[in-house]
Amino acid sequence: GPRAVPTVDEHRVYTLGAAGMLSCFDTETGDLLWRVDTVTDYDATVPVQGTSQAPIVEENLLIAAVGGEPDAKVVAFNKVTGDEVWRSLDNISETGYSAPIIIDAGGARQLILWHATAITSLNPKTGEIYWNQDFTIGGGMAITTPVRSGRYLAVSQFFNGTMMMALNPDRPDARMLWKGRNRGELPDQTDSLHSIISTPIVVGDHLYGIGSYGELRGIDATNGERLWESDQMNEQDRWATAYFVRHRDRYFVVNDSGELILARFNPDGYEEIDRTRLLRPTTRTRGGISGRYRDRAVLWAHPAFANQHVVVRNDETVVRLSLASTDYQ
């Protein structure tokens, strides 16, 4: 089954499984419409933590980070038949775990793929490379989703920190504004934002997110300068995670303790409006692959928000809860 969020397009749902199986199902019946085994068909290398990138639909294409050979790090398929339309990028480095996104910038649609050695922009219709910025990261751990807001395009990583790109307004191109520096992974050894699973947010000229050990930080997006830090949102521990979803002038945040937090973020600090428990975490970190870190229970599944409800799950239960104030009067 998939670690990545399924992708729904009209009456089809697409999943990219943890072992590299790309499947298309009918949403009404659950019938399998087509399937591609990326390991068998593309000699794909499954990452240590399992394939985790959600595929993306663009017009008649389903685009997936495959990590295959030859030159098939990313592949576009006909979304109806599953036939290959194009492939692009050599696979000399790990593909990572970050889902591709599509943006409009510089007068063009751009497919943005962040992988273990670079962030790359491609033409989603053809796979042609528009631009490429080297960014070699530790452990192949490109996990968070690239974030675009206005001229900014940001990626953030546990060991290497954040890299901020400035998108060219006139053509499909970009330049690096800044990237983080660090002496290690601990909070007192990092300068900007070192996210691992939690995708940060960009609001105006500021970047906000959860760092390597649970520290919530506000960053000047123009130069990477840290403006403030708070330890109030998350438990302060390795691999801390929180998911941010914008709602009007504030954000819904679900942290890895299973709490829903209503908050605002601004250059002066973090404003918590309220919080409540949604679900108790049941997945355990087991101290990581090496087993040398503290074992704790975490909630790492991204919530879904729709129709004034939140849907959240652990590895035992799925719950839907109302967010409408009228339900609590």
PLM region descriptions:
Residues E10-H11, E59-N60, G107-R109, G150-R151, ...:
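Short coil/turn segments that connect the beta-strands within blades of beta-propeller domains
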Residues E28, T162-A174, I219-N223, L262-E271, ...:
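Short loop/turn segments immediately following beta-strands, especially the blade-tip
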